[in-house]
Amino acid sequence: MESLRIYNTLARDKQDFVPRQPGEVRMYVCGITVYDYCHIGHARMVVVFDIVQRWLRAAGYRVTYVRNITDIDDKIIRRALENGETIQSLTRRFIDAMNADFDALGVERPDIEPRATDFIPQMLGMIEKLEANGYAYQAKDGDVNYSVRKFANYGKLSGKSLEDLRAGERVAAKDAKDDPLDFVLWKRAKPEEPAGASWESKYGAGRPGWHIECSAMGCTLLGEHFDIHGGGQDLQFPHHENEIAQSEGATGQTFVNYWMHNGFVQVDSEKMSKSLGNFFTIREVLEKYDAEVVRFFIVRTHYRSPLNYSDVHLDDARASLTRLYTALKDVTPDAAPLDWSEAHAQRFAAAMNDDFNTAVAVAVLFELATEVNRTREPALARQLKRLAGLLGLLGREPREFLQQAAGAARTGALEPDEIEARIAARVAAKQAKNYAEADRIRAELLEAGIALEDKPGGSTEWRRV
């Protein structure tokens, strides 16, 4: 098998992957700030790095995969106050929702999933080291800030110079920072903040800044110098740049060898965002599309390329995944292990070792599917199923998927409000004793892949079948 090459954002080039310890990989990925439901951009990030860790394990590495949870943050505090609930109640609720969404997408749980609030002592310890090393200072407002100008290599990840950054910076007169570019390590508590938002420290009661959370958790769990750090492209600056400044300022050594960033999800060629109103939660998407279809939609594009979200692209992903399942419908794969000497497997491995090029790897799956359709050969069916499994695909019984996909196609991906409108029409028909019409609507919905279940008290629930 060819050696793995990874595009390293720090080097701005593909590099041979050489782990610090032979046969072992330590990888940290920035996770979710849990104050709302996860969106399709989060889905892309977790699926991308799920595939990275799956391939590293398939290549024989012993992987320690850490993906954190940010459970204290300004957004969390604001949302808890708006909702009139505790921070702990809010974060617990959205952690549960996050896990349900990621499980649905077939994302394997990380080896370690630390919560920021469990690592406050380690964060304070790192801040004290930075202060001792001359990188941190306490401002007049009580915040502890990082002095960016003290770190000579600031900007090495993003390619941004301090001069260019300062030219674009505007700072309010009340700002207590020594420099507009300095960033907060420890935020002094404010009287209006709710219980559970601060911890005691030598700097006074307060809470950690976002950037120090990941530095402290990464260094504590993986060591002060580890192999891979990943996250979305939007985290490259300032978050990951600041992580480097903090970690290397505290330890005096290289923080991470390989930095990986997945591309944006776009809608109509614009980055998906709440402010533009083109924002879709995972839950909303899963109301319309099977979770494996969504995963396939993400996987078939290279992780660094923009991913264009639309119903047209998801419908096409469903049709493409249907082709792969159809190839397995009437052929039982044999029970032998994956044969890496086989030509398709070698091309698949070459694609994955070329910076996790899932777009090419998926093309190999379609080549295999064509051969399976032509030969009906169980050994080739096994290769198809095993290789797809490395991407988290084709794990279901083909007939089950195909039946569901056919129903979804018949619906034309019916919107939930359209389904509810038909249910309301059925209720009205029953109230008018027009049972033939009520039965017709039920049958029509079932034909469209929607099953109804009448509940005691007169309510009706629906599900896709």
Curated annotation (Swiss-Prot):
Subcellular location: Cytoplasm
Annotated catalysed reactions: tRNA(Cys) + L-cysteine + ATP = L-cysteinyl-tRNA(Cys) + AMP + diphosphate
Source organism of the structure: Burkholderia thailandensis (strain ATCC 700388 / DSM 13276 / CCUG 48851 / CIP 106301 / E264)
Cofactors required: Zn(2+)
Binding site for ATP: 274
Domain of life of the native organism: Bacteria
Keywords: Aminoacyl-tRNA synthetase, ATP-binding, Cytoplasm, Ligase, Metal-binding, Nucleotide-binding, Protein biosynthesis, Zinc
Record text on subunit structure and interactions: Monomer.
Gene: cysS
Name of the protein described by the UniProt record: Cysteine--tRNA ligase
Short motif 'HIGH' region, span: 32-42
One GO BP annotation of this record: cysteinyl-tRNA aminoacylation
SMART domains (UniProt xref): DALR_2
